[in-house]
A protein has these predicted regions:
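Short hydrophobic alpha-helices at membrane interfaces in multi-pass membrane enzymes
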Residues: 157-170
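Aromatic-anchored segments of alpha-helical transmembrane domains
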Residues: 21-23, 88-97, 167-177
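N-terminal transmembrane-helix/juxtamembrane module of multi-pass inner/ER membrane proteins
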Residues: 1-63, 112-113, 121, 220-221
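Hydrophobic, membrane-inserted alpha-helices
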Residues: 61-66, 142-148, 167-175
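Membrane-interface loops
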Residues: 27-42, 70-160, 208-221
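C-terminal membrane module of polytopic membrane proteins
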Residues: 183, 189-221
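Membrane-embedded alpha-helical segments of multi-pass membrane proteins
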Residues: 18, 54-61, 137-144, 188-192
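Interfacial helix-loop-helix junctions of multi-pass membrane proteins
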Residues: 109, 129-134, 171-198
Length: 221
């Protein structure tokens, strides 16, 4: 047991997840005035319920990426956590300081068609409010996982995995706007946040930061 705890002591990072969920769902329950996010471009993006598939695949994608690096490479896992958790915290702060939402969702009852995908989407619309949307965490986390995969030395020659991750990331980003879960504005700022977080997590000149972070918390390793 002691050897196991020493090997996987970086599991302490997982403690962030209950904190994040507590804060996120707390913000979801707020009764406040929301800034409506919209763009003229949103009107030109077609609604397509089929995109509910990559939208839900996001959960498996993030979990699988997280688990892979947790068990295979402590350094890559630390960099992924630095990227995701810092960015997600920034999103929470934005949602708290600048409450936002959108009114893009179609009325599924008058859509004129019903299928397994519209029923899945109806469930999503029921459980997930149209608030706290900008920046898009779906976009941000997908890009973060894709970057982690592309930056992994162990996956450099795994073309199928790399191309699959890229295509899935693009599909997830498209799903957020094609399902009218997000405005194109939310996706844009999710991408901007990804670019910002790339600097401390992966830029070569700053690459030592996660390693220094790990050493600073060496008591947990």
């Amino acid at each position: 047991m002691k050897a196991f705890l020493k090997k996987y002591s970086h599991a302490i990072a997982i403690l962030y997840l209950p904190f994040y969920l507590f804060c996120f769902f707390g913000l979801e329950q707020r009764d406040t005035n929301y800034h409506i996010i919209e763009s003229e471009l949103d009107q030109y993006i077609p609604f397509c319920e089929w995109f509910v598939i990559p939208y839900f695949l996001w959960f498996a994608y993030v979990a699988a990426t997280f688990a892979y690096f947790f068990f295979t490479n402590k350094r890559d896992f630390t960099r992924l956590c630095l990227f995701l958790f810092t960015g997600m915290t920034i999103c929470l702060l934005v949602y708290y300081i600048w409450p936002n939402g959108q009114n893009l969702r179609p009325d599924l009852a008058t859509l004129g068609r019903e299928n397994i995908f519209t029923r899945m989407l109806a469930g999503l619309y029921t459980t997930d409010t149209s608030t706290n949307v900008c920046p898009s965490i779906h976009t941000f986390n997908s890009v973060g996982c894709c970057i982690a995969i592309f930056k992994s030395d162990a996956l450099q020659n795994k073309k199928v995995i790399r191309i699959g991750a890229l295509l899935l990331t693009i599909s997830i980003c498209l799903s957020t706007v094609c399902l009218k879960q997000h405005s194109i504005v939310d996706v844009f700022w999710g991408l901007v946040l990804s670019a910002v977080m790339y600097l401390p997590a992966y830029l070569p000149k700053l690459e030592q930061i996660p390693e220094q972070f790990r050493k600073a918390n060496s008591t947990f390793y």
